[in-house]
């Protein structure tokens, strides 16, 4: 996994530079997400390894329907370098670069049950205050947490779940 990220990083930076130059962060995000989803399918991944598949066919397969010429050239570059399989990693790294440039912290809040809009607003405000930047929050539900929530920003994890508290209590009693 780390090798894939290492290989994907220069391509993500190149994609980001092209998007920044054209002021088209969102269209590139959408295009990369589409291509990453298609390339991540096991059947497509197997097809991409087929030597009979020509570069232009691979680009057509992976490009979104209304892809711009710059994006198609980018996919062609990846095809030339035999790096199309790295599209999921490239898309993830691109999103990290975009979030940094837009001064946005991406956070995932996983709770035991669905959160109310008021709870989500409180958490978002607290994260915004802590990081001093805008916060883009996505939510998930994991009933195994029992109660509370786990907040993951990539840089740090705040575990306020009952499951986590019980695990920490068990660990402290065991030692």
From Swiss-Prot:
It holds the Pfam family OSCP. One of its GO terms (cellular component) is plasma membrane. InterPro entries: ATP_synth_OSCP/delta_N_sf, ATPase_OSCP/dsu. It is found in: Cell inner membrane. Keywords: ATP synthesis, Cell inner membrane, Cell membrane, CF(1), Hydrogen ion transport, Ion transport, Membrane, Transport. It is a peripheral membrane protein. Coiled coil: none annotated. One of its GO terms (molecular function) is proton-transporting ATP synthase activity, rotational mechanism. Its main location: membrane. Belongs to the ATPase delta chain family. NCBIfam families: ATP_synt_delta, PRK05758.2-2. F-type ATPases have 2 components, F(1) - the catalytic core - and F(0) - the membrane proton channel. F(1) has five subunits: alpha(3), beta(3), gamma(1), delta(1), epsilon(1). F(0) has three main subunits: a(1), b(2) and c(10-14). The alpha and beta chains form an alternating ring which encloses part of the gamma chain. F(1) is attached to F(0) by a central stalk formed by the gamma and epsilon chains, while a peripheral stalk is formed by the delta and b chains. This is ATP synthase subunit delta. It comes from Xanthomonas campestris pv. campestris (strain ATCC 33913 / DSM 3586 / NCPPB 528 / LMG 568 / P 25). The gene is atpH.
